[in-house]
């Protein structure tokens, strides 16, 4: 799937934050979202390229798309697996 930020129902600006802060912020934000909603995460910490996909697998969310070729890195995460 191509990266389409318009799919997002909520945006999390995590630029300037360093590990483990971006993933902690994602977890806190997603906790307050409804299943099926999509979170756009913008970050510039290189560790997010590893941590965000791992978080999604571990917490049973879907990483719909990721843009990691340029800064800021951007991720689309759908809450839940449905």
UniProtKB/Swiss-Prot annotation:
Alphabetized GO MF terms: sulfur carrier activity
Active site residues per record: 19 (cysteine persulfide intermediate)
GO cellular component term, pick one: cytoplasm
Localization annotation: Cytoplasm
Keyword entries, A-Z: Cytoplasm
The keyword Chaperone is annotated on this UniProt entry: no
SUPFAM superfamilies the UniProt entry points to: SirA-like
Pfam families: TusA
Biological process (GO), any one: tRNA wobble position uridine thiolation
HAMAP family, per the entry: Thiourid_synth_A
Family stated for the protein in its record: Belongs to the sulfur carrier protein TusA family.
Role according to the record: Sulfur carrier protein which probably makes part of a sulfur-relay system.
Stated name of the protein: Sulfur carrier protein TusA
Organism ancestry: Bacteria, Pseudomonadati, Pseudomonadota, Gammaproteobacteria, Vibrionales
């Amino acid at each position: 799937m191509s990266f389409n930020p318009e799919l997002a129902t909520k945006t999390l600006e995590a630029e300037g934050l360093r590990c483990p802060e971006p993933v902690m912020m994602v977890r806190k934000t997603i906790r307050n979202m409804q299943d099926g909603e999509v979170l756009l995460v913008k970050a510039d910490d290189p560790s997010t390229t590893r941590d965000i996909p791992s978080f999604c697998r571990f917490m049973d969310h879907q990483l719909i798309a990721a843009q990691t070729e340029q800064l800021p890195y951007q991720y689309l995460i759908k809450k839940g697996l449905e």
